[in-house]
Structure formats: structure tokens, C-alpha cells
Amino acid sequence: MNLNPINPKPKPALWLWWLAAIFFVGASVCLGWYLYIQANRPGHDTPLDALAAPVFNPLPLGSVMPKGWLLEQLKLQSSGLTGHLDEFWPDVKDSGWIGGKAEGWERAPYWLDGMVPMAYLTDDAKLKAKAKHWVDYILKHQTADGWLGPERGNPAYGLIGKAPPNAVRDPWPQFIILKVLSQYEEATGDPRIIPAMEKSMRSIDLQLDQRPLFNWNFFRWGDLVVSVYWLYDRTHEPWLLELAAKAANQGYNWTSHFWDLPLKHKSERWNWVGHGVNNAMGLKVPALLYRLTGDARYKKLAWRAIEQLDRYHGEPNGLMSADECLAGLNPSQGTELCVIVEMMFSLENSLAVTGDVRFADRLEKVAYNALPAACTPDYWRHQYVEQSNQVASAYVEQPIYATVSGIANIFGLEPQYGCCTANMHQGWPKLTSHLWMESPEGGLAAVVYAPCVVDTQVQGDAVHIEEVTNYPFSESLTFNVTTARPATFPLYFRVPEWTQGATLKLPDGTIESLKPGEFHEVSRQWNGTETLLLQLPMPFKLRKGYQDSVSVERGPLVFSLGLKPKWFDFMPFKFQPAGPRKFDWAAMPQTPWNYALALNTNDPNQSLTVTQRPLKGNPFDPGNEPIQVTVEGRRLDSWQSSEGAAAPPPQSPVESMETLEKLELSPYGSTRLRITAFPVLK
């Protein structure tokens, strides 16, 4: 008898039973997970008979007007490139859209998409005259079949790649100009606009039957659908829903894209799917598809899209890295300025449709940090790409970017490409017009906070609201609500996820505690002028990032170590404009940047101290910050530059024997050279 058989007969059966059991359980789990995913993943885009209602509706352009520091930003921008680009930059001054010989594709529509709302939000007579001149010309030259603008744009821009051989008309610029016209109609009530938009969409509808979407318009179809919905909400023409569904079914499948992001690492070459602006524009698509189909799973997908980009390409400033294509988690990778403004517009759309506070929180983070940091304080120069860890703004022969050149982060008129020169203008104006929205049951919602005034009709009654605040540089907001006669309606106040202990003092003196991550409703009768006081405490939070580095957040603001720059003129290689500012600026740091922070990561409020000053002038002008944060840190000599940028932060925690120093952190938006993602000391 073999007491120690090598292959005893009873045991294989036992192991096989165990193996079968494991396989069965595993298969059941996998099948269950697959069925769960399929049940929660949005399906085909079958349109409803009418659009599903959004949670909020944006107010018409001009209903919300900027005040305080926000008005200062719009005035600075209108005195800068926004108000003058058409006077000297050939691609707008001599645009094919007004009969010129220059580019007749996306650049003039991009500029108008920001200039038109800027004109009416600043009540600038000169800009309003420019807006009218452009709109008059475009409408006068609409073709008999409805096409707006040049029928053949610039083939070097519009028809690259595998365009159909008969692709004479590129609908992508049409998508932009339709957004321009809808804003113009809201501001002026011009009766020509709605018929012109309807004719344009009929023309696009016919073209999509003959030439399906391709290239840029294949990825950016969501911007057409935004205008289709705008028109449908006013005309209720059923064919518009069919056009929206046609675009969704012909265009890129953003549903699958954002369900499981196909590009999880830095792009090593340019590609359509990873293009940052395409992704920023695509973020609005899930919300748009919810309205088209009524499928609530699209609402969930809208935030999942943000989570996917955060997971693989998220940056401390609230953006995705994209220079030009998705570039991973390294905070020295850049993000294109077009991504900033287009992501803001997508967040505004997703916020309106879903009513999800998180979209507003992210919108403020991008707007109050990344947007102002990408431009000089006078808005005459901008960067093509911006870095969270930006230790230089100068030409680099072999840059860290994979898909743009070594001049991409200088501050100039047209660094790298001119698309951002044309498209940067929409950020502040569209944010302003989306600060307040109306609720379907006849109320008003404060969805994003900034100093402003609101004048609108609520259930037939004129309502005036004055929002007095220095937010995001202050925790206090005062709302003076005025009605001409007694009127009963609800107001909704957003309570950000990041706040703790928020309160709202009502006109009768009652103080209500607020729950983070929700809209707080105050439904009552309003009479005369009544005041509410909102307090949003801003505790410090640490965002963990690449290599366990951290960035410091307080409310919507991100704080950076601002580096003292040495500026010098930098003439572009090929383009030397003859406009008011004919040179670009480059900068090198004059102060050390390679610090690791001494932080209590369990309670950062123990390690960080706030200093506040009166807000005067431009809060995003370096040296004029109304708030700073003090923290201690040590130099980290092993952390040096690489490829013209800060090397990736060393894996935290780190050790340093250098002297412990006090460091002053400034709001990200007031810095032009900076470190934002820091290693943490042991």
C-alpha cells in the first residue's frame, strides 16, 4: 500500500469540486456585475416626444449683471483682447465671415461667442455696435438654403484628416455661430434670429443626410444640440428632436467614452479621441442625452465623466491635463486654455440639467483658479497651455508636452495656435449669465456665487436681487431681495460640498443650518426689500495627487506658492502682429520653488493660517491678493527641473535637512509662475 501516493485518487475530485465552485461563484459575480453595468449604462438614443425638463433653466442673457470684482474682470477683458481683437488680428479683422480673405472657419465665431455676451454684460456701447455689425452681416449673407457664413472655410483647418471628398461645407463653425445668435436674441429680442436659426438647422439637417458628421464636427456635435434645444424650447418643432437624435447617432459615442475612458495614460501623439477640447466639449453630452431620452442613467454618467477624467488626468486646478491631448496626472503637464472655457460651458450645461451641486463646485474651482491664471491681468496676453506646477514660462527646445511645442506656455497673442486667441473670451461672460437660474416651479436658484444683480420675472412679478459679496475671497454673502408687491416663490441656495457649519439667516432673524451638497430652499412671501445672510465656512482641505503630493484648498480657491518672475519680451517665431501689444512675454523664476510642506495631513487647519486684506482692484493681479495662506516647508534639493518644467513631485513623504521656512501661498488665479502640488515632509 502506498501511504504517500504522488497522485492519490480521492483528492483530484475534491480539488475539482473546489475549482468548479470557485469558477461558479466567480462566473456568477462577473455575470451579476455585467448585468448591473448594463442596467446602469445608458443605451441607445431614442428621442422622446418632448425634451425632458432640466432641474434649472438659465436666465436670458442680461438678466444677471456682474458687480464688484466680477465686473472688474469683465471690464479688464473688454479693454484687452476681447474688445480689440477685430481691430488688428487678421483672422478676425479680415475674417471670411465678414467677406475678408483670412480664415473663414472657427475663429471669428469663437470670438463672437465671448464678445457678444461681454458687450451686453458690460453695457459697452462700442462692443454692442460691433456685435450688431457682425450679426447684421452674417444674417444678410445667409444663403437661400440657410447656410450661415463661408461655405468653404479654411481647408488647412477645417478639412484635415479623412474628410469626405464632397465635404465643401463644414458644419462645425455653424455650431458655434448658432450659440452666438441665441445669446444675441436673448439680449436684444431681434426678431430675425429665430427664423435664421431655423433655416440654418434645416440646412444642417439636410447636409447630415448627405454627408454624415466628420472630423471636428464628429466629436463636437453636442454644441449643435445645445442650440437645437434652445430653439426647440421656443418653437416646439418636432423635427428639431429628430435632428438632435441624428447628430447623437452620427457623432462620436461619448457615452461609451466616459463610461470607461479609453485613454488612461499620457498621449504620446496627437489623436482625436484624446484631444482635450473635444473631451471638454463632450462633458456636456450625457446631460444633453438625458433631456433627449429621459433616461436618468445619463444624469449619473454626467458626473462619472468627471470622475473618469479626474482619475486618469486630473489636476489640482480642477482641470484635466491636456496639452493638447490627455496627458496623465503629472502636475507639470499643461492644459489648453480652450479646455478651460469649454469645460466651464459644459459644467454650466450639466449643472442646469442635473441640479447636481458638484458641477457648480467644480465650475467655481475652474473659473476662480485656472481661468485668470492663464492670462495676464490686463487680458492682452494668454497662454496656450497652463501648468499647475509652472516654474517657467519660456521657450523650451524639448518640452514636457507630447503634442505641442516649446512656446506653448508663454504669455502672448498667439502662442502655439490661434484657437485660444479666439476662444478665450467666453469664460467670464458665460459664468456671469449662469450665476442664477430659474426653477421649473417658478423660483430662482443661486447656483454659482459671485457679486451680481438679478432682474427677472417670477410668476409674473418683477424681482430684483442684489448679491453683495467678495466671494470666493470671503465666506459671507448678503442677498437683498426686492419685489414691487407681495409675491410668494421659492429661492434656492447652493450649499457646496466643501463647507462645514453653513448657515442662512432669514429676514425674520431665523438662522437655518444647511446641509452640504444640496440646494437649500426658502419658500415664503416676499414684500418690499428683504435681506438674507449666507455664511459658508471654508475649512482647509488637502487634495492628494500625483506621487501622493498635496495641494491646498480653501472653499473654491486653490493655493499655490507664487514665484517671483523676471519678465522679458519674446517675439514669436512666425507671427508678429502690429496691434497694440505686439510682443509676447516670457518669464523665469527669481525665487526658489522646490519646497516640501510640513503639514498635519489629518487636520490641515492646524498647519495653515489665513491672512485677509481688503479687496481692492483686481484680486488676480499678483501682489494684490485679498487672501494668503501661511505654511511651513523645507527646500528639497533633489527636486529639480526637467524638460523645461518642474520634475514630477517626489513620492511623499520626503525627508529634508534644510531650514524650516515660512511660506506664503497665494490664490492660484493670482499667480503666473507657481507650485501647486507639493511633496509632504515626514
Language model region names:
Residues 221, 225-260, 270-327, 339-356:
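Active-site neighborhood of glycoside hydrolase catalytic domains
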Residues 97-101, 119-258:
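Extended ligand-binding groove/face enriched in aromatic
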Residues 302, 361-369, 374-477, 515, ...:
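C-terminal beta-rich recognition modules with glycine/proline-rich loops and embedded aromatic residues
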Residues 104-120, 169-185, 217-233, 274-291, ...:
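Well-ordered alpha-helical segments within folded domains of soluble proteins
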Residues 35-107, 125-154, 191:
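Low-complexity, Ser/Thr/Pro/Gly-enriched N-terminal "stalk/linker" regions
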Residues 86-102, 149-169, 218-231, 260-281, ...:
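Carbohydrate-binding/catalytic loop surfaces
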Residues 499-525, 542-547:
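Solvent-exposed beta-strand/loop surfaces of large extracellular or lumenal domains
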Residues 9-24:
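N-terminal Sec-pathway targeting helices
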